[in-house]
């Protein structure tokens, strides 16, 4: 079968590789669609990062480059391994693409996403969505309604990143949120916030991203910091109070500074983006306003709720697809 394989920085090859073996406890999936994540681009341009370099196998998967890429994908079940009796052939599914040690608990309340040596299918080994077929442990396979188009279903993985950021924030319906950055994660996070009943303000410079935010309907207000003073506008919108919660989705320090200034006293700031460079923060403001600054990474037991929001029609993923290849 065909697969996109990462060899090294700037070196991804389309190759013929053997089809995966569907072993006991796994599910064979024929891949329908796979998204290209910002992480994939970083691996190509700056990697290997998550991908274990050639000759340095990942401690859990035992694999190193070349690695089959792709972790945002949907597909149709074509085979089930021995012991799998709750998924049928022909079922539409998405994958929560974790690689964790076999002794790591993965039930409700378990923080398996923070476990030692955690990695992702499509980065750390075990196949990937940029291939024709993949075999995945049953635990990580999530059935979805056949009513969800499979191209849209491929976005459930990054949507779950947004859902976990929302959970980490502790926000509730009726709150006002400021999202700093309208890239894919910022937009999908905003879709989650709207579905959960929050008022959403987005700050973004890019004309294309502002247009996508408008087109998708995920923001009540879209502020361009090159045109307006974002903090002043936020204060007008919130009657001088500031927002209840803010989400940093840009890896840009000026955006983080804006969020610190725009959040109300005792408010929450969630750092969603992965920074590849040092950041600074106005600690005096954090202290004097008693702000709560939190990190978030990926997702943990978020997929079921995310899938439910899409199945119930509370989130439409179609506007977030920019191109199909």
What are these regions (language model features)?
Residues 20-34, 49-103, 145-147:
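Glycine-rich beta-strand-centered segment in the early N-terminal region that forms part
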Residues 59-66, 71, 99-180:
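NAD(P)H dinucleotide-binding glycine-rich loop of Rossmann-like/cofactor-binding domains
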Residues 161, 185, 209:
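Hydrophobic/small residue at the entry helix of a nucleotide-binding pocket
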Residues 176-182, 194-258:
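Adenosine-nucleotide cofactor-binding segment
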Residues 231-232, 236, 274-323:
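C-terminal substrate-binding/catalytic core of Rossmann-like NAD(P)-dependent dehydrogenases/reductases
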Residues 263-264:
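Helix-to-beta-strand junctions that scaffold the AdoMet/dcAdoMet cofactor pocket
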Residues 267-268:
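Glycine-centered, small-residue-biased loops immediately flanking beta-strands
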